[in-house]
Amino acid sequence: MNTKRITYLAATLALATAAASCEHEEIYEPLEFSVQLAPTNTYRTGDPVVFNFSGNADFITVWTGDTGHEYKHRNRTKVDITDIESCELEIEISQQYGTLNNLVLFAGNKFAGLNGSDAATDRPVVEAIAANDCADWTKLEFTPNNANKFETYTYDITRFADRFSWGMHLFYPDPKTTMRTYRINPKITVKFKGHDTQVYNYPDMEFVPFSLASQHADNPYIHNVSGNGNLKFQGRPGANNTANIVFQGFSAGAFPEIDQWAFMQPVALNTISPDTGLNIKGVTDDLPSYSYTYTEPGTYTVTFIVAGGNYQGQSAPAPYEVTFTVIDPIE
């Protein structure tokens, strides 16, 4: 690398009755760096691999080459749908009171989402879903009961991963009966080939409620208000903290109608976080070596991004790679 010099005019200094100007040279120093594998490395899973450094690098970032830490994937935010090994929606549900089932759960990938603040736009969408009895969705089966205990149901949603959404419909078929209380905790788990498992907990999901009940005609997005007969979401004012999502039931005849819907806004489940590196050296650190332990056999390419930057000058970041194979211990 050639040394570059950039000259600029320094700020004018006031000295009593005279002024003077000067020039200052900022030096771009050539980077000298090398990385070598320690001769004592065994390259067995569970044993540390040691990297020895020499040179004048002031900053070092390492990408260890294992899952989630490959330099070549530092800008990757999406993988092919075929790289999804499994995709599951887990719903933990508690049901209390009443003798009739008042809840339908459904999932799919044909839903474009709701506006969330424009009822004139959203109402026809929800009405169409209601009119065709969720024909474009797959209903999620669960066992109705009033046991007031949480039960967990797991659903394979891999086929919906490109634009996944799920939702619920609460209804009141017989005003002479008690409306059941529901408490729901959802979670989505996506396993990939060659990437860390991605988990979507409730805070990662955005829900939009919409009521088609006549008493909510002027406020169809109603939720998180006090009292029975309302849908409540955790993390918003007025939440019921017994679960992430709660519909508070009521005694017979307390409400003339319940036609409450809620939808998770669609999300592409093949979206991932970019791979990351680890900063292991700064200007003031003395780092003659670095070690890392691999727990899985395989061929790894480790990338070190190194740069210089101190009072003597600086250098542009440069990559250095080392490739090796790790095997399981021989019995």
Where are these regions (language model features)?
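Short, solvent-exposed loop/turn segments at the edges of extracellular beta-sandwich modules
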Residues: 174-175, 307-314
